Amino acid sequence: MTDRFQLVSPYSPAGDQPAAIDKLVANFEAGLAKQTLLGVTGSGKTYTIANVVQQVQKPTLVMAPNKTLAAQLYGEFKSFFPHNAVEYFVSYYDYYQPEAYVPSSDTFIEKDSSINEHIEQMRLSATKTLLSRRDSLVVATVSAIYGLGAPEDYLSLRLILSIGEHIDQRQLIRHLTDLQYTRNEFELTRGAFRVRGEVLDVFPAESDTEALRIELFDGDIEQLTLFDPLTGETLRKLQRYTVYPKTHYATTRERTLSAVDTIKEELKERLEQLYSQNKLVEAQRLAQRTQFDLEMMAEVGFCNGIENYSRHLTGKAPGEPPPTLFDYLPPDALLVIDESHVTIPQIGAMYKGDRSRKETLVEFGFRLPSALDNRPLRFEEWEARSPRSIYVSATPGPYELRESAGEVTELVVRPTGLIDPVVEIRPVGTQVDDLMSEIHERIKLGDRVLVTTLTKRMAENLTEYLGEHGIRVRYLHSDIDTVERVEIIRDLRLGKFDVLVGINLLREGLDMPEVSLVAILDADKEGFLRSTGSLIQTIGRAARNLRGKAILYADKMTRSMQAAIDESDRRREKQVEYNLEHGITPESVERPISDIMEGAREDAAEKKSGKGRSKSRQVAEETPDYRAMKPAEIAGKLKSLEQKMYQHAKDLEFEAAAQIRDQIQKLKTASLA
């Protein structure tokens, strides 16, 4: 383990990268609060940021606009920093239906959710890493601005164990129970412990492949060992170990009982208000629901929907922002906002949507007013908590440019020598027939084509029309979930089909070097989908191919089109000059087609397993392709496989158990995106 970032890469910075890295680092070390990295597609933005992290040596949080891009970034940073703590923090819900009330139909919708236990483990690992290591880099989504347990409580509850320390076994068991660990003598699963004489085995909640064995002798800790919970194989011996709570929302018994008292006071005040307004049904409903929750909290320390009482549990004042992942960041950390033109507006939108739903619940007696404080951060609260930041985008928005106050670092020259796609304008009247002839030309070359339309109806009709004319085409629409979207893009790259039609789903996203043509239909219809930024982003999808071309079908030149074409021409000229000066011949990007998380998860498993795990453990045979499975199917399959794995381990059939573990690892990988 090291406390310094160690960048591992087979190549050195080139093109605009050295100057960009130097400028970003100099600005950061000079204390500049905000700066922008304007990087075109294929210019090596992630590699540039990795070099900045290596030089500034600060804990880093990277925010991405969605799980797909977060997964890709996680894999890339994991390969750049294999010896450091690279973590993944996204929403752990495979499915989430928040509780809501529809007054017009008098319909109450109960909260319903499905939690991905593997992502929950990665979230716990991320917060533990931020609190315990300086060489931590966390890739997160907007989930980072939602409420977590307070870091003070999280730290105060932790159990620190050292060789030679005197500790009573009953006290140790009680402390583990306070951390919400469960005792299970039959099966050692994540978040559980077992007792065998003076030996305690604990499977830490944030660990995926390692468990802790605590050996006591006459009340002293004689030995601390990390071992494989499946085979019992010893991985390494330790002098010291810290066990963190099983959940971010763990709190002390005293704090819970204190919260029960303050909730009772709030309930009394709220009932008086409702009775004074003659809202008898609402008052009765609120009293009944809250009393039930209070009884559960007093008896077992937990209740369904306990997050709605988070203000009382954290001791915050009304209106105060909840603790979030940003509270776990040290003050000198670095924040990187990837695709900032999308991520920044997302952050501002989260609070408003959440507030509207909860106000209805409070008004009609389903929740106490304090439930309004279980919320994401407001935009201004997020700004106040953000450390020194770098906004990264090919098309920075007005907010980023304003906040950076002119400190914009350009990353326009690509080390590969690739030039921005040629942009052509063609008339709308013949756009479909012209597009078909272009598609046939690209198919002959073995390339792929992206087509973006303005409406869902047009996308459906175009997909049907192209299909009728023998073209292998798919339509990427908003109803497709993240995992399936990744699968479709992968199939496009593999050549299972040649043309992908979409509306607003092809702008920011995964790298597709096989795409040599981007067609933008009705490019002269001004609006969000045809703004300057959207056009530049869409054109950029063809920027990784030597034959890259973008066709804008339009009957008139709009300001957005002109600005996008001018910017594209400027970038082309700069790249051509660089190529001539350095004698570079452009080449298409060669990027292996694989699962976006595959390499990262393998690296993580190897790192967490330690050197004690022999190579012969990787004995899994070919397993089914799980990537297209729905979250509910994945959860069910995981439970079934885990039961089989533990049964094999009980029967001492460790090789069979290891095979199933490898299947489980592939299944978890498929669920991450």
Curated annotation (Swiss-Prot):
Motif (Beta-hairpin): 92-115
Purpose: The UvrABC repair system catalyzes the recognition and processing of DNA lesions. A damage recognition complex composed of 2 UvrA and 2 UvrB subunits scans DNA for abnormalities. Upon binding of the UvrA(2)B(2) complex to a putative damaged site, the DNA wraps around one UvrB monomer. DNA wrap is dependent on ATP binding by UvrB and probably causes local melting of the DNA helix, facilitating insertion of UvrB beta-hairpin between the DNA strands. Then UvrB probes one DNA strand for the presence of a lesion.
Superkingdom of this protein's organism: Bacteria
InterPro entries hit by this protein: Helicase/UvrB_N, Helicase_ATP-bd, Helicase_C-like, P-loop_NTPase, UVR_dom, UVR_dom_sf, UvrB, UvrB_inter
Protein name: UvrABC system protein B
Composition bias type Basic and acidic residues, residue spans: 618-630
PROSITE patterns documented for this protein: HELICASE_ATP_BIND_1, HELICASE_CTER, UVR
Cellular component GO terms, alphabetical: cytoplasm; excinuclease repair complex
Region ranges (Disordered): 601-631
PANTHER family: UVRABC SYSTEM PROTEIN B
Oligomer and partners: Forms a heterotetramer with UvrA during the search for lesions. Interacts with UvrC in an incision complex.
TM helices/strands, residue ranges: none
Species of provenance: Xanthomonas oryzae pv. oryzae (strain PXO99A)
Chain's gene name: uvrB
A Gene Ontology BP annotation from the UniProt entry: nucleotide-excision repair
GO MF annotation terms: ATP binding; ATP hydrolysis activity; DNA binding; excinuclease ABC activity; helicase activity
SUPFAM superfamilies: C-terminal UvrC-binding domain of UvrB, P-loop containing nucleoside triphosphate hydrolases
